[in-house]
Swiss-Prot record:
This is Probable deoxycytidine kinase FPV059. Belongs to the DCK/DGK family. It comes from Fowlpox virus (strain NVSL). It is an enzyme of class 2 (transferase). The active site is at residue 92.
Amino acid sequence: MDSINEFTSKKLSIEGNISSGKTDVLNILRNINNVVSFHDVEDRYTPIEKELIRKFHENPSRWSYALQTHYCMKRVRMHLECFVPSRVNILERSIFSDRYVFAEAATALGYMDDPEWALYCKQHDWYTDKLEIQFDGIIYLRTIPESCKERINEKSITEKNYPNISIDYLKTLHEKHELWLTQCKKVPVLIIDGEEDFIFDPCAKKKLINEVTEFINSI
């Protein structure tokens, strides 16, 4: 099955670790009829964000709160601006992964202290409550940290100044993804094996499209 009910209006997010393959999957899913995808690239390479990310990985305790606050606002803006009526809208990450994965990981690793965490949560709760931010479903691209690190190392060769992200940080992010999405009760979650080669394996690509299509039609 690769057809979605016509005039379906839904909003989903695709979640996963850094370099888990979300962008490649989104490029494939946008070929499904009635699907429109929004990539997390609008600000990624602006000078301000590149500098903020660089500073975070050099000194996470100093810059974690600033980075998480920036991304919280960015997710809110994506939620408000990236929506096409009567279409299935799939966003790369959400304000919820910003909190339950990245902000919680930063706190667990000691990058944000208790006052910063409290301020972040207060801001996050205000946005989600006042703006009534909700999603119809989540697609979780489950990729082991070692694979993510290998892909990051490859990117660091081709992209100048690509941040050196530690395997320990990736493992913590993976643990937070697992804790959040394997126990999530508020919204349906589809878990996809991120170790599959969706680019060069036609069978894996077809399976991905079928699973996502069936998931969207079921919610």
